[in-house]
Amino acid sequence: MKTYLSDDRPQPESQIGAALESLAHTIHERRDAGEKSYTYRLLMGDLDKLLKKLVEEAHETTLAAKGIAALDAVAAAKPDAVDEKLRSAEVDHLRYEAGDVVYHLMVLLERCGISLDEFAAEMNSRMTMKFHYVKAWCF
């Protein structure tokens, strides 16, 4: 898998780190891209449009996950009833929709002035809290 970094920053150790850093950098640069850029319009336009898009993408992600769960339920009841190619396509669809959620969330964070490092610190702080809180956060 090729990882894209838009400048000479050192390569992050993980693919997810590299992907998120590259995306955050690109989103930040789009502030100067002008009206032709979709990201620019999300950053500089009506906040409600960005929020609506984030909710829409989250909804599509939940529907994709429900599709996988439905296939898994059918497969549990009747193991030969679900084609693995169909399930694989559903997983690909979930991955695609999750990417849309992450992109729109990162645009929102950029718009609100929250850096990727600040977001990572928030996530890390949640992982170091007492077990009962982390358990509740993770359902």
Task: Show the residue positions of the predicted features.
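Flexible "arm" and connector segments at domain edges
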Residues: M1-A98, V102-F139
